[in-house]
């Protein structure tokens, strides 16, 4: 149930907030898409941990690149 609310929040961000900020994600898929896929595949706890780990790598000193959900 709460998974659905988190997924809706991510989709809201992708649709309405992200376009205003521009494309700055250094990873593919984007961090928000990665979070969406991870939570859908593994549930809120494990998927949320994967998404958090990914967000911690999203900074100018990380090379970025292709990083799919395991």
Curated annotation (Swiss-Prot):
It is a peripheral membrane protein. It holds the Pfam family YidD. The keyword Nuclease does not apply. It comes from the Bacteria. GO terms for cellular component: plasma membrane. It is found in: Cell membrane. The keyword Cell membrane applies. SMART domains: Haemolytic. InterPro entries: Membr_insert_effic_factor_YidD. Keywords: Cell membrane, Membrane. Belongs to the UPF0161 family. Could be involved in insertion of integral membrane proteins into the membrane. This is Putative membrane protein insertion efficiency factor. The lineage of its organism: Bacteria, Bacillati, Bacillota, Clostridia, Moorellales.
